[in-house]
């Protein structure tokens, strides 16, 4: 935990750390390294929100995307010291990833579950797409201490493309 404190101290004054995630009613976020739903409106929201900022992800999340996302500083956390991909920066730990993002206004943690688990203590904000449905998932967003978070925004929406109801909810850390 000391490493997280060090990382937080380095970046807290400069960089807001936000988690951005879409999940179903049971906190499901994926199956077989893919999204279990089609929600193009949320993908557009993700693009609008993260463009121009750093995005931090695990290697499996990067593999599921397949390429660096345009207009974003892509930082990939991996235990494999030989892993490289053009257009990305590589970090061995979430702490190193945070250090690489220290000059950014905002850095978004975009997954997967293990990276969310390792970085939730650093986050200032969570932007959660809460999908009002249940899907077959094998990957889940970690439980959070609700007392540590305050809902500061909610937009309830309906997807014309998929027929799904969902809400984009912003939570800020209680300080």
Positions of the model-derived regions?
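Flexible, gly/pro- and Lys/Arg-enriched active-site loops
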Residues: 13-14, 20-175
């Amino acid at each position: 935990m000391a490493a997280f404190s060090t990382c937080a101290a380095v970046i807290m004054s400069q960089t807001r750390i936000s988690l951005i995630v879409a999940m179903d009613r049971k906190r499901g976020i994926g199956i077989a390294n893919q999204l279990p739903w089609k929600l193009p409106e949320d993908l557009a929201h993700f693009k609008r929100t993260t463009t121009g900022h750093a995005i931090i992800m695990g290697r499996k999340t990067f593999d599921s995307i397949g390429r660096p996302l345009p207009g974003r500083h892509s930082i990939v956390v991996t235990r494999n010291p030989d892993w490289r991909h053009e257009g990305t920066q590589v970090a061995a730990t979430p702490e190193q990833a945070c250090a690489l993002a220290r000059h950014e206004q905002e850095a978004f943690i975009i997954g997967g579950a293990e990276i969310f688990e390792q970085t939730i203590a650093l986050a200032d904000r969570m932007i959660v797409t809460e999908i009002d449905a249940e899907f077959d998932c094998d990957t889940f967003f970690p439980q959070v201490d609700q007392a540590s978070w305050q809902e500061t925004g909610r937009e309830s929406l309906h997807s014309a493309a998929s027929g799904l109801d969902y809400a984009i909810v912003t939570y800020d850390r209680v300080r």
